[in-house]
């Protein structure tokens, strides 16, 4: 330690001089003592100075030491915190798979403790020794320390790293040169484009807009933090693949950028060869849109519509010629020409597929998958929706050959897999009819056409499907939805917003194109199967073409005139072989003339072997905005689970489009098989006009056995669940009626009311089997029962099991709602069913074996009946629903109708079920329903039996006046919704002879359901005390069964029992007639509240409870003998009939009532025993 700054004084100088001056100089000892004393004092003073200096030095050292120690402790604490927090940060970072967030997040949010000021690395609290190292490094790296620049010699290889000027000037010069080059190029492009712009678009406007757009790109990239935005702008311009503003199409910069954003466009959209010397097709464009009225559904078209007398190609280009190369090829064809169809393979190509044998499901599935994978490449230069209206065009028929080429408009959306139909997509980029270049794809043909091979049958028995351009053109804004699932589930979606009116599907798993028209035009073409002739089975994979429009241009007048002129035209289908973009060869097809008859044109455009189905008449079309009708497909050979498949040779058919109407006021002029449904599948029947054609062997609306794959109809209506279609189901054609009271009289006059089947449950209105719409049934309905139904399946139907789902055993949902209104009188019933008495008598043997089926599940709320067990509903004679404004519509009923009426009489409602000639239901009752199975399943399905749509239906209950009484179905004791399913198909059309002579068939069931009738009586009586809108009417509807308990306050009910008993004794005379205004009222579950524990009242909790129970047990508790064989029920007024199961039934009923009633204080006093 340096002590140089402190001067150490002499000890003698520090000492006091008097110490040695006062001594005697003569005496040496005295002088020595004085000098030593002075030196000692000086040393002590020197030690004091040293101590002061030491204190000053060590004080500073102590302060620095204490500061360092405190900072070390702080660092140790921070280190402990970091060690604790590190795993929680390390695990998410190391487990993160996507590191893209590292590039976009600034990183400050990860480190919240860091200061966000200027000094992030060196905060002010750093030690000075560390801060000095930062303060010294102020300047840039000292590049002069590098090696000197050497042009040649040993240091020349280090030029780039040793020359400082290269590092300084390279980046700036490159950026300046690039920017100048880009600006010059843009100016040249603007000048070039400005010379070609139209009158309305000046070069100055294009330059300024273009410059502003690039400036916008520049600013955008600067804001995003890109280092060199000029290069990014250049990359965006490189993607435009051409000049930014197209003079021919008039497309703007941004439109072209948006349209070319798909990477598939370059591959799909190739322009047609202009140098080929083959067929020339002039293309012109319509200068303005023309509003054509929607075709009238009832009246004929008014004037003012534009008539197209010739089939001509309307187009797009400024008289540029698009040429299609053709190579002649001769094909010898029969009268039955080969099938010419379009198939979706290799991104929609024109092809002719040879199918000499039936397509196997595996091959067709693979084709569908290949088509779906190739459709992803399908794209178009002009997507509908970008302000480019699409127009429908006509094809010009030349003397020798016709151009029926379709552009690639299979749009495949990656979200939904939407597939649309092959059509000539002629686009108008702007309403000002700017000229188009050929590369703008006036008629875009796919470069990758698949090989087109003529389909020539070995036996020469193919069918020629003429693909006419006016019938195959599409003009729409939104394509249809046909998603294809990996499990081959075809799902038909009905979008309310798009108002898709029709979907055509094919269960043969053929790669089939379908289109759902918008609200303007509809055409359905079904692809049928050839008749089995000569032992060969020709199943041709064909496609369905639709004509539709969503813009203001209507094609009604166009196709109307084509209908009038098509009879003498020569229609040629383009049939070519080995067509590809590389070879560039087309083959003209042979000419075939079609002479259609007027009957075929009027009805369904039916030809003997040319299965072409078009519209019936434009006046007969009823476009639906809310539902679809589906043309029934052909059956698949692989599906024969039920053993009741029909002969395919009898099913040469054309399925006509069944039009559904939202208001229900418009129907076709010719009678069809109409069904009132909401979202059900429909298979329309052929018209009567087509029956007069002898060439149509057997025209049937045959719906066959469908493919085993499950097909589901998905509707946007939330009340319509996804209904699985069973294997053997066929669909009845239906017409949606949202407002049944507004049926037009003119429309009703055209359709006989006896042919209307009311099937109006919106959830499970799947009706019929493969026999339901058979050819015999179609002929019988259209000829108004001039022919009787023939072989329609086995009468001895097998019983459907509870375990097997409907999709496996081919069961059908037979479900209806109380919209079915019974006939008004017994006389009318007898008059309606007089010709069918022999049918009723023949079915009586099957009725006696009828038992109740418990085939309901909670998910699929329809009766589980095998398709074999259902005969065609050919004589269902319901009346049309009549609205009664005086009576309010019934709420969703909890108990069945039989509980309210109380007429649990044994003499069979099941004969009335089969008495209508509809079905022979062999329904089997489950034995488990005896033991108190009074369930509240009705409340789980309130919407199933409710009358919706705001209609006031008067539900009349009628009584027969002659030999028999009207009796409800014994299935009412089950309490589930299958009671409704049976009661809705009971038309009450049996005669007095039938109802009384068949009364013995249900006597065997009396012992089973009589005991359960007691619980139902309690239930109905309790419900009556909650709802008393019509007390007088409900008194007459009290259950006509004996009370198990005698209770006070029931004198009036006893009198009702005596009246009913006297009525049963005089049953043949028919003295008592129920009021026709009886209203069945249901109780909603929301109206009832639960009873609290303390307020529960037990059944029969009265003074005489013990006595009455003892009397019951003493008299009839073990009386299990079968009922007597008399036609009348054996009612005893004084002593009720019961057994030991009554207690369990009553307990269950009481528990059910307490669960449903709720704790209502007003009704606690008057409980069951009132």
From Swiss-Prot:
Cellular component terms per the entry's GO annotation: chloroplast; cytoskeleton; plastoglobule; SCAR complex
InterPro entries: SCAR/WAVE_fam (IPR028288)
Gene3D superfamilies linked to this entry: 1.20.5.340, 6.10.280.150
Keyword Nuclease: no
Sequence ranges assigned to domain WH2 in this UniProt record: 1105-1123
Bias kind Basic residues: ranges: 183-195
GO molecular function terms noted in the UniProt entry: actin binding
Domain of life: Eukaryota
Bias-annotated ranges (Polar residues): 356-365, 640-668, 701-716, 783-818, 967-980
Protein's UniProt keywords contain Cytoplasm: yes
Tissue specificity field: Expressed in expanding cotyledons, expanding leaves and expanding siliques containing developing embryos. Detected in unopened flower buds and in the expanding tip region of roots. Reduced expression in mature leaves.
Coiled coil start-end: none
Major subcellular site: cytoplasm
Region (Disordered): 180-207, 356-376, 631-674, 701-742, 783-819, 960-980, 1026-1046
Compositionally biased tracts (Basic and acidic residues): 198-207, 366-376
Compartments reported by the entry: Cytoplasm, Cytoskeleton
GO terms (BP aspect): actin cytoskeleton organization; positive regulation of actin nucleation
Quaternary structure annotation from Swiss-Prot or TrEMBL: Interacts with SPK1.
Functional note: Involved in regulation of actin and microtubule organization. Part of a WAVE complex that activates the Arp2/3 complex. Regulates trichome branch positioning and expansion.
Domains as described in the record: Activates the Arp2/3 complex and binds actin through the C-terminal VCA (verprolin homology/cofilin homology/acidic) domain consisting of a WH2 domain followed by an Arp2/3-binding acidic motif (A), separated by a conserved linker region (C). Binds BRK1 through the N-terminal Scar homology domain (SHD).
Stated family: Belongs to the SCAR/WAVE family.
Protein name: Protein SCAR4
UniProt lineage: Eukaryota, Viridiplantae, Streptophyta, Embryophyta, Tracheophyta
């Amino acid at each position: 330690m340096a002590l140089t700054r402190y001067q150490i004084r002499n000890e003698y100088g520090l000492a006091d001089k008097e110490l040695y001056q006062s001594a005697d100089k003569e005496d040496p000892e005295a002088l020595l003592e004085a000098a030593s004393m002075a030196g000692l004092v000086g040393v002590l003073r020197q030690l004091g100075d040293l101590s002061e200096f030491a204190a000053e030095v060590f004080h500073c050292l102590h302060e620095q030491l204490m500061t360092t120690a405190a900072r070390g402790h702080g660092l140790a604490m921070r280190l402990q915190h970091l060690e604790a927090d590190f795993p929680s940060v390390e695990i998410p970072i190391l487990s993160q798979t996507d590191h893209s967030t590292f590039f976009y997040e600034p990183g400050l949010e990860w480190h919240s403790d860091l200061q966000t000021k200027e000094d992030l690395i060196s905060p002010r609290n750093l030690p000075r020794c560390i801060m000095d190292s930062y303060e010294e490094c102020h300047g840039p790296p000292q590049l002069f320390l590098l090696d000197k620049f050497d042009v040649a010699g040993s240091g020349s290889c280090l030029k780039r790293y040793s020359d400082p000027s290269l590092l300084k000037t390279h980046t700036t010069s490159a950026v300046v040169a690039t920017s100048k080059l880009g600006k010059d190029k843009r100016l040249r492009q603007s000048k070039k484009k400005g010379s070609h712009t139209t009158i309305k678009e000046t070069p100055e406007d294009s330059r300024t807009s273009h410059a502003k757009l690039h400036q916008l790109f520049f600013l955008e990239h600067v804001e995003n933090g890109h280092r060199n935005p000029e290069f990014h702008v250049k990359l965006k311009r490189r993607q435009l693949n051409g000049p930014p503003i197209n003079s021919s199409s008039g497309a703007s910069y941004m439109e072209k950028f948006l349209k070319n954003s798909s990477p598939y466009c370059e591959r799909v959209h190739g322009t047609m060869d202009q140098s080929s010397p083959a067929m020339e097709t002039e293309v012109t464009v319509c200068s303005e849109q023309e509003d054509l009225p929607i075709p009238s559904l009832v009246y004929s078209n008014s004037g003012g519509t534009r008539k197209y007398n010739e089939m001509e190609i309307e187009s797009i280009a400024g008289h540029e010629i698009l040429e299609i190369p053709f190579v002649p090829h001769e094909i010898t064809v029969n009268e039955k020409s080969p099938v010419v169809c379009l198939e979706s393979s290799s991104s929609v190509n024109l092809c002719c597929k040879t199918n000499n044998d039936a397509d196997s499901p595996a091959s067709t599935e693979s084709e569908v998958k290949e088509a779906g994978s190739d459709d992803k490449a399908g794209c178009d230069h002009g997507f509908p929706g970008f302000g480019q209206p699409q127009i429908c065009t006509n094809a010009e028929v030349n003397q020798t050959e016709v151009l029926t080429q379709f552009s690639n408009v299979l749009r495949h959306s990656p979200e939904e897999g939407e597939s649309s139909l092959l059509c000539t997509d002629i686009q108008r980029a702007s309403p000002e009819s700017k000229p188009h270049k050929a590369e703008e794809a006036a008629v875009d043909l796919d470069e990758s056409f698949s090989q087109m091979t003529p389909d020539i049958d070995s036996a020469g028995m193919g069918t020629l499907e003429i693909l006419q351009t006016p019938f195959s053109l599409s003009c729409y804004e939104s394509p249809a939805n046909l998603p294809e699932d990996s499990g081959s589930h075809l799902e038909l979606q009905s979008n309310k917003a798009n108002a898709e009116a029709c979907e055509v599907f094919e269960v043969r798993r053929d790669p089939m194109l379908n289109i759902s028209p918008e609200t303007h035009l509809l055409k359905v073409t079904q692809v049928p199967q050839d008749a089995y002739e000569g032992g060969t089975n020709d199943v041709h994979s064909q496609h369905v073409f639709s004509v539709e429009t969503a813009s203001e241009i209507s094609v009604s007048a166009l196709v109307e005139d084509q209908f009038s002129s098509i009879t003498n035209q020569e229609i040629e289908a383009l049939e070519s072989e080995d067509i590809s973009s590389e070879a560039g060869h087309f083959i003209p097809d042979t000419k075939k003339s079609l002479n259609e008859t007027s009957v075929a044109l009027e009805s369904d455009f039916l030809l003997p072997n040319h299965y072409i189905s078009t519209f019936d008449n434009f006046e007969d079309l009823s476009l639906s905005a809310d539902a679809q009708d589906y043309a029934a497909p052909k059956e698949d050979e692989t599906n024969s689970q039920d053993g009741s498949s029909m002969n395919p040779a009898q099913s040469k058919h054309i399925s006509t489009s069944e039009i559904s109407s939202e208001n229900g006021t418009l129907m076709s002029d010719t009678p069809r098989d109409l069904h009132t449904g909401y979202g059900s599948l429909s298979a329309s029947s052929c018209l009567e006009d087509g029956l007069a054609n002898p060439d149509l062997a057997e025209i049937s609306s045959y719906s066959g056995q469908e493919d085993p794959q499950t097909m589901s109809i998905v509707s946007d209506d939330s009340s319509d669940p996804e209904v699985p279609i069973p294997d053997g189901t066929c669909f009845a054609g239906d017409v949606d009626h949202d407002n049944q009271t507004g049926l037009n009289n003119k429309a009703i006059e055209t359709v006989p009311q006896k042919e209307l089947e009311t099937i109006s449950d919106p959830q499970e209105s799947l009706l019929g089997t493969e026999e339901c719409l058979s050819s015999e049934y179609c002929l019988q309905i259209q000829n108004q029962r001039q022919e009787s139904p023939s072989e329609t399946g086995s009468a001895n139907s097998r019983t459907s099991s509870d375990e097997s789902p409907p999709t496996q055993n081919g069961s059908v949902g037979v479900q209806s709602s109380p919209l079915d209104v019974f006939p008004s009188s017994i006389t009318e019933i007898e008059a309606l069913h007089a010709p069918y008495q022999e049918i009723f008598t023949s079915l009586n043997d099957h009725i006696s074996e009828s038992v109740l089926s418990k085939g309901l599940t909670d998910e699929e709320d329809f009766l589980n009946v095998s398709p074999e067990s259902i005969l065609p509903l050919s004589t269902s004679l319901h009346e049309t629903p009549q609205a009664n404004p005086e009576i309010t519509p019934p709420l969703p009923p909890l108990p069945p109708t039989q509980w309210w009426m109380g007429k649990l009489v044994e003499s069979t409602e099941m004969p009335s079920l089969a008495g209508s000639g509809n079905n022979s239901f062999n329904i089997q009752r489950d034995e488990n329903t005896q033991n108190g199975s009074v369930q509240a399943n009705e409340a789980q399905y309130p919407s199933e039996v409710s009358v919706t749509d705001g209609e006031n239906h008067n539900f009349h209950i009628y009584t027969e006046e002659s030999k028999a009484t009207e009796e409800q179905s014994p299935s009412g004791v089950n309490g589930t919704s299958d009671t409704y399913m049976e009661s809705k198909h009971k038309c009450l059309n049996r005669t007095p002879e039938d109802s009384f002579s068949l009364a013995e068939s249900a006597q065997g069931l009396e012992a089973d359901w009589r005991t359960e009738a007691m619980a139902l009586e309690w239930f109905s009586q309790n419900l009556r005390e909650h709802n008393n809108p019509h007390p007088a009417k409900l008194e007459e509807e009290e259950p006509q069964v004996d009370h198990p308990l005698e209770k006070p306050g029931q004198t009036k009910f006893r009198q009702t029992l005596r009246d009913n008993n006297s009525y049963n004794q005089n049953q043949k005379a028919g003295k008592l007639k129920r009021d026709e205004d009886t209203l069945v009222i249901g109780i909603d579950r929301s109206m009832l509240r639960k009873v609290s524990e303390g307020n529960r009242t037990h059944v029969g909790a009265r003074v005489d409870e013990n006595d009455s129970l003892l009397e019951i047990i003493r008299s009839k508790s073990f009386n299990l003998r079968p009922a007597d064989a008399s036609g009348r029920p054996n009612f005893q007024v004084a002593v009720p009939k019961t057994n030991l199961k009554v207690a369990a039934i009553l307990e269950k009923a009481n528990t059910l009532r307490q669960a449903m009633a709720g704790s209502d204080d007003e009704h606690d006093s008057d409980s069951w025993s009132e």
